[in-house]
A protein has these predicted regions:
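Fungal secretory targeting signals
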Residues: 1-21
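Gly/Pro-rich cap/lid or specificity-loop segments adjacent to the active site
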Residues: 21-307, 366-367, 372-499
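Secretory-pathway/luminal and periplasmic proteins that interact with or process carbohydrate-rich
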Residues: 283-288, 319-322, 359
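An accessory alpha-helical subdomain
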Residues: 300-301, 312-320
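Short, amphipathic alpha-helical segments that act as regulatory/interfacial helices
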Residues: 309-316, 333-337
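Acidic catalytic loop of the alpha/beta-hydrolase fold
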Residues: 318-322, 439-442
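Glycine-rich, aromatic-lined ligand/substrate-binding cores of catalytic
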Residues: 327-332, 340-344
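Long, low-complexity segments enriched in small/aliphatic residues
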Residues: 341-372
Length: 499
């Protein structure tokens, strides 16, 4: 979900039913005007800004600006365009395109297609969500044990949401994934494509199948990797992500035991170390002396229990990391070893320094609070958290799914796009390719199977490995995705690749 996938170290880094009244039709999209990018960007890309309605029920009302980038195909006669979304919510499509390395599997799309990256509404170089960083830097526990703690959490995130509303304006009310899908439909028309070709990673998978449900006749080739299931109730979402995180953590522990390069190789009880440090951080946050509250990677001066556990999930995203922006398993082991010695800098949470946020966290919560069901009160949340700890005794369910259940209880915009089964309109699309690794710390293979069952014209392939998404790893799974995108070759449903 909101966990940045890096294609290179250049960057630090789904409403399934349309429902409700039929929206007024927008006028045919005006063509997008591509032009030069800023001088600090590569010469082989073009940039554009494009205005879309904030509220599609008022197509002639207030507009918001989307920023986009295009990397031209190597072919003199390209087949068209492929849109790339790296997930989040809140992650930049522009940065994803810029970070693709020559010779990598993602770069091979350029043999036959232009590659387009868009910063979705509220994100990055598009008109951004703005919030008060001072409020966001206050850390209030979301694992609550009594009514007073619950009330404190609700009040904190109510104030955070109100700050976002005050600084952002009406855009905050229209951040749900249906509106993101409508934006992509406007851009498809503006670019002049008859079909929407799309690579969606992580949360991008939710954008993809939401678009396919809303505009089935416009779908071209669509590959979705690291599947998010936005069709089941909140308890299912929290428990599935908690379980896949916990399972992946145990894979990491086994890897350390079998790999002499792991900094914790000689530790015979890594699970015990994690439990001890989490308990200590709950009582007294662990210092993070290497963190500064400024610069390119500002982070908190200490690490509480939830920061510590969230940092572990972040370290499991890529088995081979790209530090300092994205740690891998080796770095995670080093961070845990250092934390055991009193320095948890490597696991510290982001420190917010401005009204706009480079991590995408502001936009992520703005989307999540409109897309995902919230806890109905203290008793409901306490039951969910108690149940989750059974599935995840080490990580305690500290995941993005839980953050939406907790932080959104009193958010300043209503739930607009709650989970529900995919509508049957999606049966009218061409073949859609779904991809998941077996041990993804943020996107459960259980989610992928659920979505496969709801999209008749889909095939689900697996990577026999760990980590969040597969496309950027340049293995056989990436090659299979490209064979589908470039040639229309669909692997047999259920195929498993080793890389």
């Amino acid at each position: 979900m909101h966990l940045e996938l890096l294609f290179a170290a250049l960057v630090g880094s789904a409403s399934l039913a349309s429902g409700g009244a039929v929206l007024p039709q927008c006028s045919p999209a005006t063509p997008i005007q591509w032009g030069p990018c800023p001088s600090d960007l590569p010469k082989d890309v073009q940039c554009a800004q494009y205005k879309v309605p904030i509220d599609y029920s008022k197509p002639n009302g207030e507009m918001t600006t989307l920023a986009a980038i295009r990397k031209k195909s190597e072919s003199p006669k390209p087949k068209g365009s492929v849109f790339l979304n790296p997930g989040g919510p809140g992650t930049s499509g522009i940065q994803a395109v810029l970070s693709i390395l020559p010779g990598s599997q993602p770069s091979k799309i350029l043999a036959e297609y232009d590659l387009l990256g868009v910063d979705p509404r509220g994100v990055g170089q598009s008109t951004p969500i703005k919030c008060d960083p001072a409020i966001w830097n206050k850390r209030v526990p979301t694992l609550v044990y009594n009514e007073a703690q619950f009330d404190a959490m609700v009040q904190h995130w109510k104030e955070a949401g109100e700050s976002c509303r005050r600084l952002t304006g009406p855009l905050l009310d229209f951040m749900d994934t249906k509106n993101v899908a409508r934006d992509f439909e406007q851009l498809r028309q503006a670019v002049g494509e008859s079909k929407f070709n799309f690579i969606g990673l992580s949360y991008g998978s939710q954008i993809g199948y939401t678009y396919a449900e809303m505009f089935p006749s416009n779908v071209g080739r669509m590959a979705l990797d690291g599947i998010v299931d936005h069709t089941k109730p909140r308890v299912y979402a929290v428990e599935a992500e908690a379980n896949t995180l916990e399972t992946t953590l145990h894979r990491f522990i086994d890897w350390c035991g079998n790999n002499k390069t792991c900094a914790l190789h000689n530790n015979t009880d890594i699970a015990g170390l994690i439990k001890r440090l989490a308990a200590e951080a709950e009582v007294s946050p662990i210092p993070a002396p290497k963190c500064e509250q400024s610069g390119d990677l500002p982070c908190q001066s200490n690490v509480n229990r939830e920061d510590f556990l969230a940092g572990i999930q972040g370290g499991l995203i890529l088995k081979t990391g790209m530090p300092p922006y994205q740690p891998g398993w080796s770095e995670l082991a080093e961070y845990l070893l250092a934390a055991g010695k009193g320095d948890a800098s490597g696991l510290s949470a982001h420190y917010y320094v401005g009204e706009t946020d480079t991590t995408g966290d502001f936009a992520s919560l703005a989307v999540g609070c409109q897309d995902w069901e919230h806890a109905k009160g203290f008793a409901d949340l306490h039951a969910i958290e108690d149940m989750t700890i059974v599935f995840a005794p080490l990580t305690l369910g500290i995941t993005q799914s839980l953050s939406y259940v907790t932080r959104c209880v009193a958010w300043s915009t209503p739930l607009k796009n709650p989970q529900q089964p995919i509508r049957q309109s999606i049966a009218d699309t061409p073949e859609i390719l779904l991809v998941n690794s077996f041990w993804d710390p943020a996107a459960s293979v259980q989610w992928a199977v659920s979505i496969r069952e709801q999209i008749p014209n889909s095939s689900l392939i697996f990577r026999h490995g760990s980590g969040h998404t597969s496309y950027g790893l340049n293995g056989d799974t990436s090659k299979a995705m490209n064979a589908f995108l470039l040639k229309g070759k669909t692997p047999a449903d259920g195929t498993t690749f080793e890389s």
